[in-house]
């Protein structure tokens, strides 16, 4: 399973990605090295990919199963073609935000 957390610079991708990977028992990969991602997925692991994606070609190349779009800055990027969770504002509590993401993610997988 490949979970992509994408957004503009300083949108909070890493702030969410690291604790999310820990809560899901997933591997955290910053910037999406394709060979590493393929290896982890082949082993049956869930991978959290933390990547700045200014355009949809980058997203399509990663071929994620689940997309979290961090749309929290004034910088505009292409809207991802398929978004499972759209985060529109900064969060007061990272733990609460990650818990909400995990809950919605698990609901979508069942």
Description of each model-found segment:
Residues 5:
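Hydrophobic anchor at the beta1->P-loop junction of P-loop NTPases
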Residues 8-46:
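Conserved substrate/cofactor phosphate-moiety recognition/catalytic segment
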Residues 12, 57, 96:
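Residues that form or flank phosphate/diphosphate-binding pockets in enzymes
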Residues 23, 61-62, 108:
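Alpha-helix C-cap/termination motif
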Residues 28-30, 69, 88-89:
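Structural signal for conserved beta-strand scaffold positions within catalytic alpha/beta enzyme cores
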Residues 42, 46-83:
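ATP-dependent NMP and nucleoside kinases share a basic, alpha-helical "lid"
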Residues 74-110:
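Conserved GTP-binding G-domain of TRAFAC-class P-loop NTPases and closely related GTPase folds
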């Amino acid at each position: 399973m490949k979970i992509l957390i994408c957004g503009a610079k300083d949108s909070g991708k890493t702030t969410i990605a690291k604790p999310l990977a820990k809560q899901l028992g997933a591997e955290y990969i910053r910037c999406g090295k394709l060979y590493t991602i393929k290896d982890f997925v082949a082993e049956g692991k869930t991978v959290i990919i933390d990547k700045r994606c200014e355009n949809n070609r980058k997203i399509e190349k990663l071929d994620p199963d689940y997309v979290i779009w961090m749309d929290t800055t004034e910088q505009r990027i292409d809207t991802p073609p398929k978004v499972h969770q759209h985060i529109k504002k900064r969060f007061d509590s990272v733990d609460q935000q990650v818990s909400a993401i995990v809950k919605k993610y698990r609901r979508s997988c069942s």
